[in-house]
Amino acid sequence: MKKATLGALIAGAVIGLGISYVTAVLVDVTGKPEFCASCHTMKPMVESFHNSVHGGNNPQGFAVHHCTDCHLPKKSLMGYLVAKGISGTQDALAEFGLIKKVDFKENYWEMKHYVYDSACLQCHHMVKEPEKALSMSESSRFAHKYYWTQKKKGADISCVSCHNDYTMPHFAHPGLLDKLREE
């Protein structure tokens, strides 16, 4: 192999790795609550998240680290990246007034469109087989069996159909709806 060809291959590999690294860092940084809170419209969401079970306000002190852990689909890397690009672009355009901002107060109960079951199931995988989840109460096992039965029938049901701030005030964004009403 000629030195020029070998040099071009090595340079291409180094450039490719560099681009991959920068992309991975940007994907990580732009999913963190601090980044999301840099936009005025997301501040109430980030504040309420930090007071939630998922934000670390739990006996274990465990916290979900990125807004995108819950608010982007997790079925495939490509689907995740495409959704992140679309969502981020829409958020940025709305923040700068180029498109209409999402009315979070008006769309609060449409959360099934921006909280993904695939994200919930990454951590709460035991609900996939509720009959085997001995740590769950009997009523919780029953409810999750119902969820899976309905899902198989094609019902429009999601984790947040039941798990939301109204039914579980300590959930992901406690007091968010009240805070949005104040604005």
Language model regions located:
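Short sequence/structural segments immediately N-terminal
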Residues: 2-183
